[in-house]
Structure formats: C-alpha cells, structure tokens
C-alpha cells in the first residue's frame, strides 16, 4: 500500500544500491573466512570460526563464614580418658598374664631338664635314708675324662675295702693278743671316718672338677689327695698302736702269733701298698689332665672368691658381724 501513497509527480529519490541491508550485512561480516579459503585445496569446506562470548560482569567475592566445631564437655573428655586407661590396663594385664605363662613354661622345661633324682649311694627304696648325690659318668663327665674319673672312683672303693679288711685284721690281732685292743678300736674309728671323708674330700672335688672344669676343685683335690697318699704310707708301714695292719705289725706277729693272723695282716699291708701305688699313678695322671685344661692358681682364687661372696650364708654372717660391730661402737 505504500506504493499507492507515493507521489508519482514528485522528484525521484536517489536510491543507493549499496545501502541495501542485505548488501551491508555481507560487507560488514568478518573476512577471516575469505582469507582462510583456498580454492585449490582438496577440501573446499570453510573453517568455522567459533564465536567468542564476551565475559559477563564480575561478581564480588563473598567470604563464607567458618563454622566452629562444637567443644567437648569435660564429662566427655573424662569418659574418653577413662576408657583409654581401661584399654591400656587390659592390654597390660593380658601381656603380664602371657609373660607369666611363658615364664612358668620355661621353669617347667628347665626343671624337667636339670632336676635329677639322687642316685648315690644306691640304697633300696624301703630304706629310710635316701641317696645324697647324683652321679652319672656318661652324662656329666666329658668323654676324655670318664676313664680317669672312673679309676678314681674305683680307687675310693678299694680304699673303703682296705679299711674294712684292716678292721678285720686288727680284730684277729686283738683275739690273738688282748694287748692290741687299742689298735682294734682305732681301726674301727679309721673305717668310720676315712671312708666318707675320702669320698667327700678328694673324690667329689675331682668329680666336680672334671664335670665343670673347676680350677678350685682341682686344687682341693691335689691338697687332700696328697695328704691321703701320706696317710697310705703311714698305714702300709704299720707303726704300733696306730690301728693299722702294716708291714711292721704283720712281721711282729710272725714270732709269737698265729700264722693265720700273720697272713691276714700281710694281705692288708699289701692292700695299703697297692692303694699308695695307685694313688701316686692317678695323681700324676690327674695333674697331666689339669695342665691340659689350662687352669691356673689365679683362676682358682677367682672361683673361690666368687663362690664365697655369692653364698647366702657368708653374706648373712658378714652382715651380722658388721651389725654387731656397729652396735658395739
């Protein structure tokens, strides 16, 4: 309808063909696509340029308020601490019980391994007196020392038999001559004293020395056994009124005594001579073994001092003496 409103008699308006909106839109469009277009390339597809969006207005930073955690009450803290202590106590009790159980097991194992019933002297079960010592050469004595240790044990047995035969010889001598009653009484005393003393004073020390390689026990044996050899020589000589049936006593009965008594006394004198000879031989053998072990007198002194100071009896006596001296002052 606008075409009818125009005045056909008016001057015509100059129309610019380049002012057409469709033309201006094309001319204002970005020319990047034309610059990137290559008509000679294999693909004639134009590169699409993404349109960039303008950033929006910046928002002000807002600080979020921090929320404080709730503080525990004193009752809750005390309850938590008590619960922790209870847990620790239970753990300690459990560990203590476990340690006690292991210690008991170790003690039982050690008791089963080391505790042995005494077997010497070998007495019958009905006897009220029980064995006093444990003796086993195969388990306690090293293989290198078993033979010499057994020989010393056999020497002690020969020593006991000789003293018993000496008692019988002195009894026969007393029956043939009543003046020899003193010799018979002393022979009984020697048998009752020297038999156990020899076992305790020189045989047991050498047994302990070979068992544990103890220098102090070696020195005890050497001292006592040397005295024992001296006693053997006195006994084999047979001095009068000493309670021994030696060579002099046996020869004195040949003139005015029965022949049987003389023979018995000479046999006993031969036993004393045999004991003296075996004692010298075994003393030499033990000394050779002693030097082979590397023991010394200084080591024996150290073992003696350690044994003395570790003894409860010695410590008790020393403390009592010190207390008495302090009170006296």
From Swiss-Prot:
It comes from the Eukaryota. Residues 175-181, 240-262 are lumenal. Residues 1-74 are annotated as: Disordered. Keywords: Endosome, Golgi apparatus, Membrane, Phosphoprotein, Protein transport, Transmembrane, Transmembrane helix, Transport. It is found in: Golgi apparatus, trans-Golgi network membrane; Recycling endosome membrane. GO terms for cellular component: membrane; recycling endosome membrane; trans-Golgi network membrane. The modification Phosphoserine is found at residues 319-320. Its main location: Golgi. Pfam families: SCAMP. The chain crosses the membrane at residues 154-174, 182-202, 219-239, 263-283. It is a multi-pass membrane protein. Residues 203-218 are annotated as: Interaction with SLC9A7. InterPro entries: SCAMP (IPR007273). Residues 19-31, 40-51 have a biased composition (Polar residues). Residues 1-153, 203-218, 284-329 are cytoplasmic. GO terms for biological process: protein transport. Belongs to the SCAMP family. Functions in post-Golgi recycling pathways. Acts as a recycling carrier to the cell surface. Interacts with SLC6A4 and SLC9A7. Interacts with SLC9A5; this interaction regulates SLC9A5 cell-surface targeting and SLC9A5 activity. This is Secretory carrier-associated membrane protein 2. It comes from Mus musculus.
């Amino acid at each position: 309808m606008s075409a009818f409103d125009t005045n056909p008699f008016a001057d015509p308006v100059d129309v610019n063909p380049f002012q057409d909106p469709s033309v201006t839109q094309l001319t204002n469009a970005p020319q990047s696509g034309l610059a990137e277009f290559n008509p000679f390339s294999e693909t004639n597809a134009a590169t699409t340029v993404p349109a960039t969006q303008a950033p929006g207005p910046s928002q002000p930073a807002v600080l979020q308020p921090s929320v404080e955690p709730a503080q525990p009450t004193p009752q809750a803290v005390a309850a938590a601490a008590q619960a922790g202590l209870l847990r620790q106590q239970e753990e300690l009790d459990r560990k203590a019980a476990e340690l006690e159980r292991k210690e008991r097991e170790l003690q039982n194992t050690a008791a089963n391994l080391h505790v042995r019933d005494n077997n010497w002297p070998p007495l019958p079960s009905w006897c009220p007196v029980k064995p006093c010592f444990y003796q086993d050469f195969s388990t306690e004595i090293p293989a290198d020392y078993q033979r010499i240790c057994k020989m010393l044990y056999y020497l002690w047995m020969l020593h006991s038999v000789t003293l018993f035969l000496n008692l019988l010889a002195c009894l026969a001598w007393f029956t043939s001559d009543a003046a020899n009653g003193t010799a018979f009484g002393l022979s009984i005393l020697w048998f009752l004293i020297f038999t156990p003393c020899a076992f305790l004073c020189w045989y047991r020390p050498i047994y302990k020395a070979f068992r544990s390689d103890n220098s102090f026990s070696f020195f005890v044996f050497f001292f006592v056994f040397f005295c024992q050899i001296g006693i053997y020589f006195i006994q084999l000589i047979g001095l009068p009124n000493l309670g021994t049936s030696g060579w002099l006593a046996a020869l004195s009965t040949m003139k005015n005594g029965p022949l049987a008594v003389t023979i018995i006394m000479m046999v006993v004198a031969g036993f004393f001579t045999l004991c003296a000879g075996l004692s010298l031989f075994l003393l030499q053998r033990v000394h050779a073994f002693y030097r082979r072990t590397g023991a010394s007198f200084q080591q024996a002194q150290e073992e003696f001092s350690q044994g003395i100071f570790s003894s409860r009896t010695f410590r008790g006596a020393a403390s009592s003496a010190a207390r008495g001296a302090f009170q006296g002052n």
